[in-house]
């Protein structure tokens, strides 16, 4: 099946309300792609190179997850890309054959072939023209698969390196399609500011609810902040003003912004549930440590409200990655500063509450769970200049088993001990995806 044919098939199945879960994986992927519902076989870790360590380069690291394998829990392959680019996030194409990753500093995009040999990905293509293509967007962050194309969120721009940014779309062949700038107070592009919201033009994550034609984007900070030393930034009053405070609702099909919501404190990851009647999404705010609900009200209008605190906001635990369970009943929330993961009961999305917590290590960032929720994986790095220093700079991938009551460690991979670097985003692979 050709890639464009796959995209059309996926879109058609979803439009008819059919489940497109031939296989399935981590529950926070684009709904357009197949999922790994069974046992994930590999985890790909996009890793930041460290000066003086190993080859010093950013790399895609593959860890074996196959039950019974002699190398289970071990690194079995690594692909270096040349230099340090501030490796950060990545996402699969809609056919799941290619894994797109980005560098927040150099603005390079690396596309890996993960289908030819899922145990041994290969660098397929590098895009060096992101800033030029997009008309000045900097910091390719989230890679969200659409049928036949990849939507990429920017974090910054090449004018003032602040937070003003855009969405950038490429086709599956890596050819530039279009740029969609975030609305600002000076240029709302037809969007409406809800309540006291002020459109700041910032970007970070992107997710979509296809059957409602709704796309949401969140907001973080620009290059001048995310490349600054974390301690230095905290002492810089002007820098601390340069964080996003908005979530934007878009028309998925026309790519036009519709509403701007006031969500103070840098809302980061966005996650929609999977239920056919679940018309809402969650996000967390990094600086104010709150869980937010973006939801459709009884009148069919989308709204946003804070629904829970995460830890003690006064301690600034710094919520980072989140992962929603496939049954829409629970939500894992990691917080970087205290190294904790917390599990929230979200069975009533308007009244979530914490039911469990565990310290993973001295710092923790990303979380991914299997489709059945029985296996949960954690990785460590936030940003090269924001990670902790000295003995607190733990860099790892850790795998846990979850029985509904307790996380029990299965195995851990020390990325510093192996000379790999800083472990960031994780994505699962399986040869079963490509067997037919």
UniProtKB/Swiss-Prot annotation:
<comment type="similarity">
    <text>Belongs to the selenium-binding protein family.</text>
</comment>
<comment type="function">
    <text>Catalyzes the oxidation of methanethiol.</text>
</comment>
<dbReference type="GO" id="GO:0042597">
    <property type="term" value="C:periplasmic space"/>
</dbReference>
<keyword id="KW-0560">Oxidoreductase</keyword>
<dbReference type="Pfam" id="PF05694">
    <property type="entry name" value="SBP56"/>
</dbReference>
<keyword id="KW-0574">Periplasm</keyword>
<keyword id="KW-0732">Signal</keyword>
<dbReference type="InterPro" id="IPR008826">
    <property type="entry name" value="Se-bd"/>
</dbReference>
<dbReference type="InterPro" id="IPR011044">
    <property type="entry name" value="Quino_amine_DH_bsu"/>
</dbReference>
<protein>
    <recommendedName>
        <fullName>Methanethiol oxidase</fullName>
        <ecNumber>1.8.3.4</ecNumber>
    </recommendedName>
</protein>
<comment type="pathway">
    <text>Organosulfur degradation.</text>
</comment>
<dbReference type="GO" id="GO:0008430">
    <property type="term" value="F:selenium binding"/>
</dbReference>
<keyword id="KW-0614">Plasmid</keyword>
<feature type="signal peptide">
    <location>
        <begin position="1"/>
        <end position="24"/>
    </location>
</feature>
<dbReference type="GO" id="GO:0018549">
    <property type="term" value="F:methanethiol oxidase activity"/>
</dbReference>
